[in-house]
Swiss-Prot record:
Lineage: Eukaryota, Metazoa, Ecdysozoa, Arthropoda, Chelicerata
Function: Beta toxins bind voltage-independently at site-4 of sodium channels (Nav) and reduces peak current and shifts the voltage of activation toward more negative potentials thereby affecting sodium channel activation and promoting spontaneous and repetitive firing. This toxin is strongly toxic to mice.
CDD domains: neurotoxins_LC_scorpion (cd23106)
Native organism: Centruroides villegasi
GO MF, any single term: toxin activity
Protein name in UniProt: Beta-mammal toxin Cv3
Stretch forming the signal peptide: none
């Protein structure tokens, strides 16, 4: 599974500036999911890869980013 990492409180994606390989996104994806997850910056948000099927990613139901 793949998807944008999301803030559970406000429903927003984790923003990033440096597109492509990005240490911040990789670190956040691994902290949120697990150490074998991958992550990079895509369309100015952190995209996580190699996730388990039940991983919660953007968009969250009934939550809009404010």
């Amino acid at each position: 599974k793949e998807g944008y990492i999301v803030n559970y409180y406000d429903g927003c994606k984790y923003a990033c500036v440096k597109l492509g390989d990005n240490d911040y996104c990789l670190r956040e994806c691994r902290l949120r999911y697990y150490k074998s997850a991958g992550g990079y910056c895509y369309a100015f948000a952190c995209w996580c890869t190699h996730l388990y099927e039940q991983a919660v990613v953007w968009p969250l139901p009934n939550k809009t980013c404010n």
